[in-house]
Amino acid sequence: MTAKYPDKDSIAKLLSDENIPNQIMEHEPLLTIPPAIEYFTKNPPSVEAPFIYCKNLFLKNKAGGFYLITAAHDTKIDYKVLCKLFKTKNGNIREAEKEKLSLYLHVEPGHVNSFSLLNLSDEQKKEVQFHLDKTLLEKYKTIGIPPMNSSSTCWIKPDDLKKLLEKNGFTVNVTDLNEIKGDDKKEDKKEDKKEKKDKKEKKEKKDDKKKEKKDNKKNDNLDEDISSLGIQNKKEENFSDWYSECITKSEMIDYYDISGCYILRPWSYEIWEKIQEYLDKKIKKIGVRNYNFPLFVSQKALFKEKEHVEGFSPEVAWVTKSGKGEIDPPIAIRPTSETIMYPAFAKWIRSHRDLPLLANQWTNIVRWEFKNPTPFIRTREFLWQEGHTVHATFEEAEKMVYTILEFYRSVYEDLCACPVIKGIKTENEKFPGGYCTTSIEGLLPNGKGVQAATSHHLGQNFSKMFDISFLDKEKNKQLAWQTSWGLTTRTIGVLVMMHGDNKGLVLPPKVAPIQVVIVPIKTSKDNAEEILGKGNEIYEQLKKEDIRVTFDDSDLHTPGWKYAEWELKGVPIRIEYGKKDLSKEQVTFFCRDNLEKFPVKLTEVVDKVKEMLDTIQKRMFQKQVDRVKNSTTHAKDFDSFLEGLNKGHIVYTPWCKESFCEDNVKDKVKEIASKSEEQDTVGTCKTLNMPLDQPKLEEGTKCFFCGKPAKIFAVWGRSY
């Protein structure tokens, strides 16, 4: 069954509806207590003190039943104590299996929380007891609990949490988890005596093995713990948390205290600069020039085009105050710039000689999304380029639309090695107020489609509203034809999701901030000068060829640590070498995309780097092409369509092209999901686009859903 409260936004809405004060902070996933304590020590919440972060356990009793415990993070949870408190045999209390977490609470391991009780069915409520640590109510004003996912924390008064759960039909057992009677302590001491002796013997054996292993190391530093660098979540098991780990541990982003807003660090911003440079050259070649327009838009201008503003209205952020004074009327922060640019276009254009007007700006945009934010993919503030052009004819505008769409395809496929589908949006999915919308769509490894970029033919709708007109060669007044098009930092999220693996990022060479890292292996001071000298020599050779290279000769970490760090950051090629390699006049190449190693002669390093950068780029693209091909279903009927969606595929279907049919498909999928008890049943879907590269539509083909004559093939999928 679908969770009633699947994410932090649903919890935030519930707390708002109940008028319960709270603060929700976003951060990297805090799957265990130590990183959580470290994080909140550095980034304390703005809440009433004293406050404390909580640990949450979901336990099962072998004799029957489950317990969810919320306690102060420093409360010691002894399962023997719990057995006595819950009046069951020693050894009966243990952690619930992953499957039970999913079935009862709708969470993954590492994300157990008190709010997840709200997802229990009436029958499940009879099986689960909730115990709230007495310490929380007696000592703390505010407690921190993950709101369904440990990538954010909700700070709330413990009494408010208690009342909320009681209002929703739960008995809240306020329990002293440290409570043990004297007789029990004596019994425990007897029981524990042998156990402690056994543990001591095991520890001594373990320590002996560790010492033996350490003594065998040639380098005292080689036992350096590199586990903290690794990605804890598996891409194929927990995609969302894997993604969060990738982009934070690789230093692409940092979280900010306003939900949906993120700090882009150099490792991601430099990728954006590569994309910007690539696309900027292309649009300038066809005559587009860069502008910079204001961030703010007046209420009057924004509401001038009714259909347009209705499409963005829920996402518009308004400035309503200046100091203590009210701003009347309020000023909007641009969700897009049509209504800012077009009054200026109307002033600048008088004659056919002023056309075409081809404008672009690289800027930031604010859209106050209410959906669950995902860095780079769905955020409240993001970087983008937005192009706006004005033409004398429909055909000129149409040519511009498809020229830009091809540029966008090239950004994704040729630069980022991410395959996309070029196509036209349906009437339901097109840009509000436009004539038609074209798009490029991608398929992510989690089975979701993603709108990668859009190019819109606006027709004359906006030129009518803003009186963008010109005198033609015969001195007749004509309304102009317009286009708008945009590409965002979503590109970064897409390439991370497509190419990344369980070691971290895998960056396409063309956008990687660093394409090659050189890591020397020094075993003694005797050969350090020779080793470092050769590394510097290779570094200078590659730098002369405009290859983005770094030489990691730091003594702070071992080679093993450096390997893990640069693999996490996704650098395409690592060159590693030591004294033995140099004696053979060679180095070792490591390719990040397929994890292969091979020797390369010193005299061939530069040529081999160039060759491998090109090979890796092509290999990464082909790997994704093959993945998408294997994740595509062609369906002629609704059952096959649904089967494809539930596999995480995109689905090509013959379709009647009717908007009401599209709506009916969405409603039917949602209805089926609401009645299904299968965890993997898809609850939502949409048309991604109608591909420009159409399969052959045989005469007499029917719409896969309504049975009317099919007019076109559409691509459907789940989507961000």
Model-found features: residue ranges?
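NTP/phosphate- and nucleic-acid-binding module
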Residues: M1-Y720
